[in-house]
Amino acid sequence: MLLAIEGIDGAGKGTLCGELLALAEAAGVRAAALSFPRYEETRFSELVGAYLRGDMGAIDQVPVRYAALLFGGDRFESRGKLMTLIADHD
């Protein structure tokens, strides 16, 4: 099973994920978490970091489609890790 949790910064995604992992473990379910962007783990995530730091200009001046490409590229580069986690967990 793949479960995606999305929300703005500070919304409690990490807390919810931790609670779900604890519940899964208590139930004997093999579970894992993967967080995006995967800062410094993929080339695209390095670019996401540069974008968020403002290294590419003010965030409101960077085309939204370009920013979306960076975030999507990070997920694409992470597909091998994601597929391994899916195969190795319940």
Specify the residue positions occupied by each region the protein language model found.
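P-loop (Walker A) phosphate-binding loop of NTP-binding proteins
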Residues: 8
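ATP-binding Walker
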Residues: 11
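Hydrophobic alpha-helical packing residues
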Residues: 20, 24-25
